[in-house]
């Protein structure tokens, strides 16, 4: 049990439970990945960990409300979660295999600031999702077979 995770859960007002600690550890061990509740459930099922799907949904929703994870609705409004990043990034999503690539681009960031200033809006946050198809069909085949 990670002492840091216990402190984090206490800090955001969540009770320390085995499912919360287990799900948090999974998210931390896969910082650049995006998981649906079903993905998390299947991983635990394969590991022989007895955490129910309803519990996974509930914990991920609690983590989202506590800003431990961020919820995205990439694929047809299906929620996926990633550990709350320390630095801003945007996403490119393949419509065929669902692979998510993270990127940062200073030109895009600057242009968004210019546009918000033009309209007199003080920009707080934003999300950029770019959708397309993998240029390497083998990449999609590999992801779809998993």
Swiss-Prot record:
SUPFAM superfamilies: Winged helix' DNA-binding domain
Dimerization: region residues: 86-146
Residues at which Fe cation binds: 88, 90, 109, 126
Result for mutant: residue 4 to E: In strain: F3031
Pfam families recorded: FUR
Protein keywords: Cytoplasm, DNA-binding, Iron, Metal-binding, Repressor, Transcription, Transcription regulation, Zinc
Residue numbers spanned by region DNA-binding: 1-85
Keyword hit for Ion transport: no
GO cellular component, one term: cytosol
Record localization: Cytoplasm
Main localization category: cytoplasm
Binding site for Zn(2+): 34, 82, 91, 94, 97, 102
InterPro entries attached to this UniProt entry: FUR, Fur_C, WH-like_DNA-bd_sf, WH_DNA-bd_sf
Keyword Translocase annotated: no
A Gene Ontology biological process term: negative regulation of siderophore biosynthetic process
Stated role: Acts as a global negative controlling element, employing Fe(2+) as a cofactor to bind the operator of the repressed genes.
Subunit (UniProt): Homodimer.
Name of the featured protein: Ferric uptake regulation protein
Organism whose genome encodes this protein: Haemophilus influenzae (strain ATCC 51907 / DSM 11121 / KW20 / Rd)
